[in-house]
């Protein structure tokens, strides 16, 4: 695993693969992205310290824990299948979870920010493997979607889809996207797929080419 050890300092640490317990899934990481949040953590501008970096990822099932036969959409999963996990947990007890707003669970970041030396160690995407917990959503990836596309599905893509869903966009709406960075490109593509007219603005001319 690649662990933060200080501001702009990382260390490769080696651990034995953890035992897969009931409800868990051990995944081998195929591809991981560098998110803007990872940069903030690297620069020491985030609450997470000394954790395993990375959260945007796609991987293949190595081992399924007892009771795991499908993903969270009900599709059958088996070793070797590609999957994409949600990087936060859902405690199922806080007000946000009880209201169905799992993305803002009070304890959602407990696992992601865990110290690298704490078992099960494989808690970030910048590692050979990743352990999905029993209360952590994951989804099987369709064969026709390449790794470099799906790796960002659990963060940037899903965040922009959620934002667009909140504004109740309809076909022929005019959408102005301020900023043509990663999130801006995601929101532009999603808006376009919904039939909206998309206008992108950015102070960096090269991003608009």
Name the predicted role of every residue range.
Residues 143-209:
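Mid-domain Rossmann-like dinucleotide-binding core that forms the NAD(H)/NADP(H) cofactor-binding site
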Residues 17-32, 45-98, 142-144:
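Glycine-rich beta-strand-centered segment in the early N-terminal region that forms part
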Residues 37-41:
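Cytochrome P450 core scaffold surrounding the K-helix E-X-X-R motif
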Residues 52, 56, 125, 136, ...:
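Conserved active-site and cofactor/substrate-binding residues in soluble primary-metabolism enzymes
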Residues 2-10:
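Extracellular beta-rich ligand/substrate-recognition surface
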Residues 34, 48, 92, 136, ...:
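Short alpha-helical
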Residues 5, 16-17, 48-54, 117-122, ...:
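Short Gly/Pro-enriched turn/cap motifs at secondary-structure boundaries
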